[in-house]
Amino acid sequence: LGKAPTTDDLKKLSPNEIHLTIKNLNAGYGKMEILHNFDLLVNKAQSLCLIGPNGAGKSTILHSIYGFTNIFSGQIEIEGKEITNLSPAEKLKSVGIAYILQDNSVFPDMTVEENLLMGGYIKDKTDESYEEAERIFEKYERLRNRRNQPAKVLSGGERRLLEISRALVMKPSVLLV
């Protein structure tokens, strides 16, 4: 009780195929270090929920994985490939990391369809994106009925659905929410 789990403890919790590995990560914003010797192992197809009080470092962990923080030391890997110092765009293209921001990230003046297709443009796979977008429109009538309208007409819940759908169009191997 009261101590952080060791890497061996984490391996016992994630004995299968490790997808995401964080080793001895020291990261933060500017010169301020928020994470100190942080370790994490996540299996392929595993979901993980970070729970803790305000200021505990949950967002900093996600930001570090995606590339929004300064990494002072340590390593982040996806299936054994080091990605620690890659840009967010490189992480998306090379290992498939997508991030849904906490705040609204819908482009209000673009149509629902244009918003949905943005994920594919970022990943340079527009043909696949059109197919995925059609699949999403088939599944979600609310988005389908507004596909040619500006996204600003969507309710808060519909905007969140659009953000999540846009991330899924990219077919990420890691989805940070």
Residue positions per predicted region:
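Conserved ABC transporter NBD signature motif
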Residues: 74-82, 93-94, 128-133, 138
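ABC-type ATPase nucleotide-binding domains, specifically the catalytic core motifs of the NBD
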Residues: 30, 110-131, 139-141
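The feature captures the beta-strand-to-loop junction immediately N-terminal to the Walker
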Residues: 51-53
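Helix-to-loop junction immediately C-terminal to a conserved catalytic motif
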Residues: 66
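Conserved ABC ATPase signature
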Residues: 150-154
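Conserved catalytic motifs of ABC-family nucleotide-binding domains
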Residues: 171
